[in-house]
Design a protein with these regions (language model features):
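Active-site substrate-recognition segment that forms the wall
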Residues: 1-42, 170-178, 187-262
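Helical element adjacent to the flavin cofactor pocket in flavoenzyme catalytic cores
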Residues: 95-107, 119, 126-192
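Short beta-strand and adjoining strand-loop segment in the mid-core
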Residues: 86-90, 105, 136-139, 258-261
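Dinucleotide-binding Rossmann-like beta1-alpha1 core, especially the glycine-rich loop
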Residues: 1-116
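Short beta-strand/turn micro-motifs at beta-sheet edges
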Residues: 121-125, 240-243
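Conserved beta-strand segments of alpha/beta enzyme cores
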Residues: 110-112, 162, 211
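Conserved beta-strand termini and adjacent loop/short-helix elements that scaffold enzyme active sites
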Residues: 114-119, 166, 247, 256
Length: 262
């Protein structure tokens, strides 16, 4: 579920001042980031959360269908698995979990509530430091994200796509169905364009007059080589804000997020 839940207002201070917390912030970047922070906090309420959840659900539903179509055309052997994902928690934040479960139920998301025994039946190597969980048995996880992207890229080229590597200087929408993109070498015209530059996207969206509250988030992970067989599927510990995923490179542990600009 999206991260603008009402309880985030209470969790953030605790995360920031804990040396083992999942959130880090560069304090000298706060003045520049303050407008984004204020808009984010203003949206940490139930009404905004339900609004975001509704439209994220619509996008994610369509994206999975689109991926399924692509996966039928590429070889994802040893790159992708469909073994589901498990979220676990303790009674400490049970109200937040109950709200998330209800929101997903209302949106028609298929989910199965598990007790400790049922979780251990699925993942016997996990220490039972939790009191319950939720299982989404239809979920995919990537064992090699780079390998999957490479396969999709190769399919794109095979279908007649062109890959041009140039630095974009500016872009503007000349009409409803035409975008002008100027690079360091020439100018291009496209009927449809997608801005997918990660943290650098805002420089381009600003040129289109779109006031998008976008800032930078860095994520960090650690790989434990040779331990990927300890679990069969991703497990997310919601109370601590971290997760583990079995991958080809090893068991990946993720959870630390840094907000600090480019």
């Amino acid at each position: 579920l999206q991260l603008n839940r009402p309880d985030v207002l209470y969790d953030v201070p605790k995360m920031l001042f804990s040396s083992s917390g999942p959130l880090a912030l560069k304090w000298n970047y706060i003045p520049k980031m303050l407008p984004w922070i204020l808009r984010y906090l203003n949206n940490c309420n139930k009404k905004s959360m339900l609004h975001t959840a509704k439209y994220m659900h619509q996008i994610l539903n369509q994206s999975m269908d689109a991926y399924e179509e692509i996966f039928q055309e590429i070889d994802t052997s040893n790159l992708l698995e469909q073994k589901g994902i498990i979220y676990v928690w303790t009674n400490k934040n049970l109200k937040s979990r109950e709200l998330e479960i209800k929101v997903r139920d209302d949106l028609g998301v298929k989910q199965k509530i598990l007790n400790v025994k049922e979780i251990l039946d699925l993942e016997p190597n996990v220490k039972p430091v939790f009191t319950g969980g939720c299982y989404y048995d239809y979920a995919y996880h990537a064992r090699d994200p780079k390998g999957i992207v490479k396969k999709i890229f190769e399919l794109f080229i095979k279908r007649g796509g062109k890959f041009i590597k140039e630095n974009v200087k500016s872009l503007k929408q000349s009409s409803y169905n035409e975008t002008l993109i100027e690079t360091e070498k020439k100018e291009y015209k496209f009927e449809k364009s997608v801005i997918a530059c990660g943290a650098f996207s805002k420089k381009l969206t600003d040129q289109l007059g779109e006031n998008i509250p976008l800032d930078t988030e860095r994520g960090y992970h650690v790989h434990f080589k040779g331990m990927e067989s300890l679990i069969k599927r991703p497990i997310i510990f919601l109370d601590r804000g971290f997760g583990m995923t079995p991958m080809n490179q090893g068991l990946r542990a993720v959870g630390t997020v840094e907000l600090g600009g480019l």
